[in-house]
Amino acid sequence: MDTIVTMGLVLRETRYKEADRILTILTPELGVISASAPNSLRLKSKLFSAYGLFCYSEFVLVPGRNMYTVREASVNTIFHGVSSSIEGMGLAMYLDEMAVSLSPTGTEAGKELRLLLNCLYMISRQKADLRVIKAVFELRTMSECGFLPQLACCNVCGKYDDASFYLDLQEGYLLCPDCAQKTGKPCNLDAGALYALRHICLVEDKKIFAFKISVGSLAKLSAVAEQYALTHLDKPLKSYSFLKSVLP
């Protein structure tokens, strides 16, 4: 039978029978897939480490009726540092669940995979504030999934910048302070948060974390990013409550 060779990030692992696992894997060519990993729970298995949560591995897959079967796997990267703090692990689980919820199935998901790998690397190596990583993932993921906010200017008067702005969380348009006041909308972004919002949603992938933001602006950006993402999800994320308990 023909096999498929692909890189993939393990997003979930579920024990099945005595020594098997069912894996949920995010791949660049096939999107999110389910795969059976026979005997992968046996400690003597050469493939034991390749199947772990947040392991980025090369998989040799055999297509089946309902799911793939993993024939071989070799580890590329294990994000050990993710579990070095409860806050980091909580964030990783939240990003993981959002990726499973929003990434396509049966089609290309290279952008989604690169973003998640980048964020896990940033968490693992403590390269950025966890709230920055969270906001970047939420906003960029929403943008890639068809919910890119209308960030060019005020939706009414066309003003590009000001000391504050309002982002409509449902429709994704901006209002300047004057237009927001006329409609009774309280501004939820300051200038720094708006700059970061535009940067995250519009810049090329490799520069996505190349911005600076003040503590005050980050608080506004973080709140808007979270609310915007949760507004457009089909269902609540189970990991959200735990994340908020460790990273308010």
Q: What is each residue range found by the language model?
A:
Residues 1-248:
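Non-catalytic alpha-helical scaffolds and adjoining flexible linkers that form interface surfaces
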